């Protein structure tokens, strides 16, 4: 069936919308566990839909001026509503405005924060700053860190196991690549330093 990928994408979109309704219902009921599970499921479906678009060349960056500190503060509020982990924000070096696709960057950071929420022992740190002409978003946790095989994954490798972390990383690298300034493109880097460290760098 030649139209199956498009049909699957439409189905994912529909189910994601239904899950968003479930999220709203859980919020009204104050059911934090149901809220967390529904939001994770909705985020996974969003990644699948965006992965389909990336694989078919339909994913585009809609770049405009945004305040990086604002999106981080909004995601921090969501994080704190779902987790007892300590969340530290380092926004003092964040530029007032920067040009990027806010929706795509939000999706990437939300996914990374969900992973940090699952693996951190006690704390997660999020920072935004400018480094060598790039806008850098960094998320670090105090968990076990990234496994060695993930640190060596090729830049645009498609996750063979369909894992949430692998799919999120695949999308993050596509999102980074969509942001360009001349010959310079965005990059994603992973590292371990007392836990996992994720960096998304976008050229300014």
Stretches found by the model and what they are:
Residues 141:
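Acidic ATP/Mg2+-coordinating residue in the GHKL
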Residues 162-174:
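Glycine-rich phosphate-binding loop
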Residues 115-117:
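Short helix-loop "hinge" at the ATP-lid/N-box region of the Bergerat-fold HATPase_c
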Residues 134, 145, 185-199:
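Glycine-rich nucleotide-binding loop
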Residues 86-96:
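Conserved catalytic submotifs in the C-terminal HATPase_c
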Residues 171-185:
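Conserved glycine-/histidine-rich ATP-lid loop and adjacent helix of the Bergerat-fold HATPase_c
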Residues 33-82:
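Conserved DHp (HisKA) dimerization/phosphotransfer helix of two-component histidine kinases, i.e.
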